[in-house]
UniProtKB/Swiss-Prot annotation:
HAMAP family: Shikimate_kinase (MF_00109). It is an enzyme of class 2 (transferase). Pfam families: SKI (PF01202). Substrate binds at residues 36, 60, 82, 139. Belongs to the shikimate kinase family. The lineage of its organism: Bacteria, Pseudomonadati, Pseudomonadota, Gammaproteobacteria, Vibrionales. It comes from the Bacteria. GO terms for molecular function: ATP binding; magnesium ion binding; shikimate kinase activity. Catalyzes the specific phosphorylation of the 3-hydroxyl group of shikimic acid using ATP as a cosubstrate. This is Shikimate kinase. It catalyses: shikimate + ATP = 3-phosphoshikimate + ADP + H(+). Transmembrane segments: none annotated. GO terms for cellular component: cytosol.
Amino acid sequence: MAEKRNIFLVGPMGAGKSTIGRHLAQQLHMEFVDSDTVIEERTGADIAWVFDVEGEEGFRKREEAVLEDLTQEQGIVLATGGGSVKSKENRNRLSARGVVVYLETTIEKQLARTNRDKKRPLLQTDNPREVLESLAGERNPLYEEVADYTVRTDDQSAKVVANQIVKMLEER
């Protein structure tokens, strides 16, 4: 990639956005940024605390402000939060300011990858499968709408997926 364009990774929790994003940034000599980490840094608290105190709506407002800033940078690989695509403004920013890659995965893989993670407020429930299925129904069409590319992450290592994305971008 000759030009320093942004790469935005979207997809559900547990798809591998952060892990794959780090590999991708390293391979492309770009900076890796995780929007959830930036929200935590700016807030001075973790995501679960923000959800507890401000609710999902408060969190989404913070996320929107962070994405407004981050999408204006150049040469970054950005792992977005799973729900960032709920906002039309976020979808528009992502589409206009970089290449969007949807990391697709199954509910089974999401459950396996997130089952011990207590930092996922939406999964702190008796039936995480039901929550993930509901989120998939709501969000998957939005991921598809905004994506320039879609890559399934289920049975491949993060490094292999990152290599696939690099090849797609080179063929672009």
